[in-house]
Structure formats: structure tokens, C-alpha cells
Amino acid sequence: MSETELRRELLTHLIPWGRTTHSAFYLPASSATAEITHVAFDLDGTLTTTELLPELARLSGRSEEMTALTEAAMAGATPFRESFIHRTELLRGLSREALHSVIRSITLPTDTTLLLRELSLPTAIVTGAYQPFVEDICERVGLSAFVGSAVRYTADGKFDGLDPEAIIDAEGKRAFLEEWTAGALASTLYTGDGANDLDALAAVGHALFYTAQHGDLRGLVHQILSADLPPLFPTTR
């Protein structure tokens, strides 16, 4: 079994615990370079404390159902792609205006916004979240590198679900990082909080598991960039 496969297996067991306890832990690979050249983040639940889909489901009174389905997928209890398509079907028919209104209502923690704006390294948001959400967040913080799942609208502007050919799943995240960094995964720091981040976290040299409820992303990232955070250093809030 390769080191990447071993890291993926370890993360598979650690992620449900980390989500339950709102913990953060750092897992560098043996191939990790001392100097980090690229930094990337998941979006929902990592950069934002609020998840988009439960907020959209609130418009139809199904927020609790959506929250439970989302948590099951992020903890790895249900397959991500299957769950994402099902959860998206619950939102079909929302107006474009309603979707964008909810997107604009979701804020980033102040320290997270500061972190994204102050990083001097190439920085990207790598997420399976809806592309309009990712684009909106990137515009707010001045980032141009991102990937998200494309969505469709009907001719009269109603939300019509996902483009099945453009869903960003765990493999899609890893593939984006490979291309964006020109293969420099050993010198890349990736931060994520769910099962959809497994492939990316296992592939990069510097993996940080972090849930937004932990509340110290800026401090942890700067510790890693300055080589001050020990491997598998679990912190809880």
C-alpha cells in the first residue's frame, strides 16, 4: 500500500471524529517540502461557518433534513456524488434571484477574510459547492483560482440542478490541484473538512483538516507556513 493510500485510510477514520469534535489536525507527507508554494481551501464548512445547501433548503422549510443529509455525506456515511445529486434535487425550482440572495447572505469570518487577502502565495478555493457560490466568495476576497460544480437554470430562470458532467467530487479536487500546481503537490497546503476532501488531503504534501467551528484557521495556516505546527497536532475548540 502506498503512502497516499495509507494517508487516505487514516483520514477516512479521522474525519468523522474531527467533524464531531470540531477539531483540526495537520498531516504532512514524507514527501512534503519545507517550503510551501501553493495554498488551497475547501469552501463550505471550511471557510464558511454556514453551509449553502441547508440555507437554500430553509426557503422550503427543509433545512433540518438537508443538514442531516449534508453531514452524512461529509462524514463519509453516504457517497458524495449520489448524495449531492439527491440534495440538489430538493432545491430544484428555486429562482435564480433566491439562490443568489442566499449566496450573498453567507459571510466569511473576519480572520478568514483577512487570511485569504494577506496570503502572498498562489491561493485557490477548491470545492464541490455550486460554482455561483464559489465565484461570489472569490470576488469578495480577490481570488481568481477556483473550481466548483456547474449548475443549470431553465429558460425562465429556475434552478434546474447540476450539470452531471461538471460535478467536482473528491477525484475532481485532486485533479484540479494537480493541474493548478503543475504537479507540485508535495509543496501544496490543502485545507478541507469532509469526505469529499479525502483525495486532495491524501495527495498533497501538507494536509490540514479543519472545520470552521474550530475558529482559528488563520493562526493554524500561518503556523504551518512558518513550520511551527507539529504533525498530527490535534486542537479543539
Regions found by a protein language model. Name each.
Residues 1-21, 25-151, 155:
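Alpha-helical substrate-recognition element adjacent to the catalytic core
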